[in-house]
Amino acid sequence: DRMEGYLVELEDSLMNFRDVEHRGVVKKEQEIIELFYFKFMDIPLLSRMDAVAEYFIDEVETLKGFDLPDEEREAVKNRFYRMYETRDLYVLYNRFLRQEGFPSLPQVQYEKRKLRYEDVYPVLYLKYRLETQQEDSGVRHLIVDEMQDYSMIQYLIIQRLFKCRMTILGDREQTMDGEQQDVLTFLPKIFGKDIRRIVMNKSYRNTVEIASYANKLAGITEVELFERHGKPVVEKEFPGLEEALESVVRELRLEKQAVIAENADEGVEDIISYETAAVIARTADEARETYYILKEKLEAEGFDT
């Protein structure tokens, strides 16, 4: 909503109209304003002046009875473009950030500009709202997976980019975001109320034990579990990360000698170990610390890490 308000504001604040004269043909400021805000009002803001310039050039060519050379046409267009205070999306987005009280982007030379990940999609949205875009992408059906990881502004961009039928699927409980969002609350506002919702509630990826445990943590109750059983999930507490990872190494059967000792009554060829294993942490910092501790422990056991 704040971005939409900013776009409306730009319609006036970005413009500085003036008379234009070329080869004795004059287009008054008021005439340009009427063309800009009425005749060509459906064209995006930063592309609209191009239509006004072409309109004026056509008038000049009609009155003079010949076509203007390409270089002359470009020179006339540039005079119209200068009625924009700026056409630089980086500058326009920076102005929006300051206006909303957010940290500004660095004021650096063009070739040194960089956008943070969280700024990429707002800038893209500005671009697709302010500039004319090619309508037909050639895509006839678009599939969006992991729907829960897309923000509202990303869906707005998708809706503008692709005018085809779509299948959007995902699991809101599996979001990578820090805060859970239900995209179904805003998808109808973007794609219209005729969207068809299909709920698939049969879990097949995990064993009954793992799925039941995960669903209990997430507060999920309306799920039908695929009847495939495995070992029960075990919860353990440890005084620290070091001790927890020692248990992880043992539990995942990565310490060869420990596995053999624990299963002395079995033949070595009968002992099950894992080719791959995963340790999941809650944060990037925890994952980094876990990695270094595990790396040291596994290297001590002769594993190539």
Residue ranges and their predicted role:
Residues 4-141, 153-155:
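Conserved helicase NTPase catalytic core signature
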Residues 103, 128-141, 148-305:
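Conserved helicase motor core of SF1/SF2 NTP-dependent helicases
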